[in-house]
Design a protein with these regions (language model features):
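Catalytic Walker B motif of ABC-type/P-loop ATPase nucleotide-binding domains
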Residues: 162-165
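ABC ATPase nucleotide-binding domains
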Residues: 238-251
Length: 251
């Protein structure tokens, strides 16, 4: 498979203090990669570093073979979208306007939405199950609805790589199933690469091709879910949960 992103001795952290040892990982076209780890392990910092939202302490990130720093912000926004747990500051925007912002990398900030752009926006809202909220103020939504708005915004951005930090947070069970279906459709049919984080063990183990596991000040561990289970990595990090679960490769 074609490699779309690779890190070289990447150090992430703040004020010169690395959160974990050097990170050497890669993402390939069409893969769904899950990121696991306790709060404070550096998951959000890794997302922000890979998306150039913050600078690394050391090392480099290559996107499609080119140093991430050599892309302009406009170029980067056409290559990856980012869904964070942080929400927009201007909470009084309409749902439609927030999602529409995902189209601007394709149009330019001053360009007017075309009919086809508006249709893409409406389709994305329907895909995540909030078409009926198009004209609602963002501030009036529940946490789960706000999360769906941000996922819809990433969908309309239509990038080859999608980063999603805790996309299942605040979602009820039916909405989580919808999210899984969306990720698989994007990956298998449109060959998009998805990196998402979660504390949901079912999402991490059942619905990813690769799994990255982080812990404070520990090397990032990576492999298929099955490999990490067999190596005892999952047992080390999630022993209380795994003891109660039975996964298809354990049968």
């Amino acid at each position: 498979m074609n490699e779309v992103l690779r890190t070289y001795n990447l150090l992430i952290g703040y004020k010169g203090q690395p959160l974990i040892p050097e990170v050497n990982v890669s993402l390939c076209e069409g893969d769904i990669v899950a990121l696991a780890g306790p709060n404070g392990s550096g998951k959000t910092t890794l997302f922000k570093t890979l998306s150039a939202s913050i600078k690394p302490i050391g090392g480099e990130v290559k996107l499609f073979g080119k140093d991430l720093r050599d892309y302009s912000p406009t170029e980067r926004s056409s290559l990856f979208s980012l869904v964070l747990t942080e929400k927009p500051d201007d909470l009084f925007l309409k749902v439609f306007d927030i999602v529409a912002a995902g189209r601007y990398p394709h149009l330019g900030l001053l360009a007017k939405l075309k009919t086809e752009d508006e249709q893409i926006i409406y389709d994305s809202l329907q895909t995540v199950g909030i078409g009926h909220l198009t004209n609602r103020n963002f501030v009036s939504l529940s946490d789960g609805e706000k999360q769906k708005v941000m996922i819809a915004k990433a969908l309309v951005q239509d990038t080859p790589i999608i980063f999603m930090d805790e996309p299942a947070a605040f979602l009820d069970y039916p909405s989580k199933i919808e999210l899984v279906n969306i990720m698989h459709k994007l990956s298998r049919e449109q060959h998009k690469t998805i990196l998402f984080s979660s504390h949901d063990l079912d999402l991490l183990l059942r619905h990813s091709d690769q799994l990255w596991v982080m812990a404070p000040h520990q090397p990032l561990r990576q492999g298929t879910p099955k490999e990490l289970v067999e190596q005892g990595i999952i047992d080390d990090y999630f022993k209380p949960i795994v003891a109660k679960e039975e996964f298809y490769w354990m049968k």
